[in-house]
């Protein structure tokens, strides 16, 4: 089920727009993704004493794109259903809160459209919540937030591959997350098939 969700995400993404957005938000994205993964893992394991898989799942969802990242990493980790449920529940609750509270904080701090869009894309996990918060703040904030968020979503690919190497048991063969390649194919199909259909229509 989780693998199909990740592939489905690809059908909603435009490859060209995602790569173009990478040039604009790359610095923020790299720092936020790597930093969040490290800090999340450290806090979860050392302070909250959360088990390894749940801590890694929550960190992945926080760093990249919420439930989609958890759905991508879970099968690679061979995470239990209970661990997946806890991670997804945690992320979705935080997203729901962020959707309503971020625009209020943005206005209270008198953030510009660009500042809020960048902040929302980096700090809010799930794509739908980023879009909702951006739209509530303004059209420009929505465009900036969506653009940077696309870049973060692409990190699903290296994250799943790295996870398969890092969490490989001794003597166990590396499990290649093949569904990630279907995610890429879905994104390519959505980009070029839609463009071709649009051109034929005109």
Label each region the model flagged:
Residues 6-11, 40, 158-164, 180-192:
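Hydrophobic core segments of alpha-helical transmembrane domains in multi-pass membrane transport
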Residues 50-98, 115-138:
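Alpha-helical membrane segments and immediately flanking helix-loop junctions
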Residues 23-34, 115-120, 146-154, 200:
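Structural signature of hydrophobic alpha-helical transmembrane segments
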Residues 15-21, 107-114, 136-144:
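Helix-coil boundary and interhelical linker segments in multi-pass alpha-helical membrane proteins
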Residues 138-169:
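Oxyanion-binding "anion nests"
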Residues 1-2, 197-202:
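Conserved small/polar residues in nucleotide/adenosyl-binding loops
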Residues 28-59, 93-111:
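Transmembrane alpha-helices that form the ion-translocation and gating core
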Residues 13-27, 46-55, 79-84, 169-176, ...:
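Interfacial helix-loop-helix linkers and transmembrane-helix boundary segments
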């Amino acid at each position: 089920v989780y693998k199909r969700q990740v592939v489905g995400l690809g059908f909603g993404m435009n490859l060209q727009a995602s790569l173009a957005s990478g040039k604009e938000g790359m610095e923020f994205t790299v720092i936020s993704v790597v930093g969040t993964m490290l800090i999340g893992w450290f806090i979860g394991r050392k302070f909250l004493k959360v088990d390894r898989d749940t801590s890694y799942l929550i960190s992945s969802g926080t760093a990249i794109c919420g439930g989609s990242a958890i759905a991508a990493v879970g099968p690679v980790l061979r995470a239990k259903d209970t661990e997946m449920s806890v991670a997804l529940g945690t992320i979705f609750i935080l997203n729901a809160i962020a959707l309503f509270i971020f625009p209020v904080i943005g206005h209270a701090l008198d953030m510009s459209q660009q500042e809020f869009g960048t902040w929302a894309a980096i700090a809010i996990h799930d794509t739908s919540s980023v879009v909702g918060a951006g739209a509530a703040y303004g059209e420009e904030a929505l465009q900036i937030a969506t653009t940077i968020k696309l870049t973060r979503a692409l990190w699903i690919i290296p994250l799943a591959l790295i996870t398969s190497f890092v969490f490989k048991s001794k003597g166990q063969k590396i499990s290649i997350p093949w569904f990630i390649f279907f995610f890429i194919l879905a994104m390519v199909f959505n980009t070029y098939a839609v463009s071709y259909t649009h051109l034929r229509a005109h």
